[in-house]
Amino acid sequence: SFGKNKERFDVKIAVMNFSGNVGKTTIAAHLLKPRMPNARIYSVESINAGADASGVEVEKLRGKKFGSMIDAIMMLDDAVIDVGASNVEDFMKMMQQYDGSHEEIDIFVVPTVKEKKVQADTVNTVRALRALNISAKKIRIVFNKLDVEESPSEEFPSIYGLASGEKACIVSDAATIRMNEVFERLKSHGKALGDLLEDPTDYRQKLREATEQAEKEHCVQMVALKRLSVTANENLDQVFKAITK
């Protein structure tokens, strides 16, 4: 297990997949950042909006600045590197060039969703990381966007096979982010999950006092969002525990 105690969680995590649209930003902004409050977030991105669209401050980097990023990371206790799909290949080339640089990263999180093409890309991402001599136990899969009743081992047989057959990565049923509309709704509000959880406003009380229809609707929405955010947060706690143990 990483980290000395609950308050100081020292770990450096890279998030990547050759496929886009796997919810990388949800993972950087909502899963990792709130549980690693001191972490600096690096976004290695040439085209995507990245984590800054989710109410989280990021440092933007193009793939070529790899060397200076690795130097900076060596000085930090914890960091999150959010690598855009179109930059993964460059990022891996750089890791190869800067031999041993992957040792500065404790965990490679590879998020995936059910689509067949994405699953194939996920297998390729894991194999490419292994080809760089990154140890399988540092490569952790996060299954994203599964309904509550869906089982990851049934939905992702090829990835479970990769873990058991090739021993190429670590999979765990607990590392599953369940579908929750709170993530989409947060995106449209430009807020992070933590903002909702820490919002002290009693919206049910406000609803009773509201006179305008629009304000009433806003209060009802906020009550629902806060309820969803509690469920999402418990789910993410479980996922974080699974990928960092």
Predicted regions and their residues:
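G-domain G4 guanine-recognition motif of GTPases
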Residues: 18-19, 112-114, 139-156, 176-190
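Glycine-rich phosphate-binding P-loop
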Residues: 13-28
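Short beta-strand-centered segment that lines the nucleotide-binding/catalytic pocket of NTP-utilizing
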Residues: 37-50
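Switch II (G3) loop of P-loop NTPases
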Residues: 77-93
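Beta-strand-loop-alpha "switch" segments that mediate conformational coupling across diverse proteins
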Residues: 158-220
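Inter-motif core of Ras-like GTPase G domains
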Residues: 92-115
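A conserved segment at the C-terminal end of the G1
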Residues: 25-38
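Conserved C-terminal guanine-recognition region of P-loop GTPase G domains, centered on the G4
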Residues: 116-144
